[in-house]
Amino acid sequence: MSLGRRRFLAAGLGMTPLAALLSACGSRGDWPEGMQEIKWDRDTCVRCTMAISDRRFAGEMRGGPKNTVFKFDDVGCAVLWVRDKLKDFPWMADPETRFWVADLRSRGGEVKWLDARRAQYLTKTSPMGYNFGAVALPEPGTMDFAEMRAHVLAKGK
């Protein structure tokens, strides 16, 4: 083997860790199976068009024959979107439709995602003023999805 070829092979082997590191930079992170990545501060809420910035209140719905995705900055926007658009997207009422909300207690860049219909909700100031944040388990002052939904629908907007 010539000296030039050895250098070429050695350089290629030396670049392998760098290539692995760079490929990790484009990874999807800890998104649940089937959830489309939310691009923070760039993606907008399908209902109010506000940028999705506060990770503690974000949500996403995915389903239907085309696996359509809707992203939300506030669970209240999601509730009202379903009310307003159910005729256009009847699959949103299907229990098979996936619906995620961020855990209110998520910190930093790490977001824990919850099934919106199984989560519990605390009263907490939220981006659009519907004032509910999701937590995983019942605790004093929480309500289930149906009760939170009723409050949002009563408030309207």
Q: At which residue positions do the language-model features occur?
A:
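C-terminal motif of bacterial Sec signal peptides marking the signal peptidase cleavage site
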Residues: S23-A24
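Alpha-helix boundary/capping residues
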Residues: M15, D84-K85, K155
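Beta-strand-rich cores of mature extracytoplasmic or soluble domains
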Residues: T97-K157
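Mature extracytoplasmic domains of secretory-pathway proteins
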Residues: V69-W113
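N-terminal secretory signal peptides
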Residues: G29-D88
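N-terminal secretory signal peptides and thylakoid transit peptides that target proteins
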Residues: M1-T16
